[in-house]
């Protein structure tokens, strides 16, 4: 699984709407509003192939209403078992 963190600047009047629109894009697993940075939102994108990433970010996330600018960071490795636990969980207790 390829994981990317997309830092997003949004027109201040459109932050909630942009966050909702971005959260509904296939491949976007999470969207957070943030403070203390030069960005308004962070989206976590998880896809199987780089071709999907090359479509999701420039053609969908960047074109959501109100988005002004994006910067993308790719994850090389996860040091948390959270993702693995969730991936293999059957939901049985």
What is the role of each PLM region?
Residues 1-93:
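A compositional/biophysical signature of low hydrophobicity enriched in polar/charged and small residues
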